[in-house]
Amino acid sequence: TPADTGLLTPLEVEDHTYLYRNEYTLPLGVMVPYDLEDNWQLDITNPADVQNDLAVVLGADPVLEEVPSEILGTSFTFTPEVSGDYYVYVSNKKVEKVSALMGENTKSFDNVNRGYMLELGWITAGEEVTLRNDDNEQDLVAVAYRFIPEGLESVYHVLNRNSMELTKKTDTEITGRIDTEKAGLLYLSIPYDKGWSI
């Protein structure tokens, strides 16, 4: 199950609602290398390659692993050898709607031509997965990936090694301190909002 990956710790269950703690939550600010923006290849069309490239640039392990698959015209199929979280990237931009059949479960995806990763969820080893182009007669050219929990753990440890400790937090001010092994860029995970200053 997803809980077996060590990424989430179950905290509470009430009716059919589950509460988990994410074990790999980063603090508000972390140090990244000066050359991150120059070396991280953001213009790659496949988002899985962009994520893996970030991991490599940081000096960590990849977070997504390509799995063997087969393109059968308007269908795409694969059978995982390992249980885990699986994703598919459809590279044919003429495909807009895709349905995924995983055992007895189905999922539908719209706007696939926007180039996002299709999150299939947890799939058990040996369970065949079939995706179909529900939109037209275009070939379903795609790539399947398994999420690698150890890769995320590796990225987390690299980023968390030099992280910011909050010393004050109010509605209008955030103060913190950071000790770092070497000079770099301070990355803050605060979305831009007019009125804030550093």
What are these regions (language model features)?
Residues T1-E81, D85, K93-K94, M117-E119:
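A cross-kingdom signal targeting lumenal/periplasmic-facing segments of multi-pass membrane
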Residues A55-S197:
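Active-site-proximal, structured, solvent-exposed surfaces of multi-pass membrane proteins
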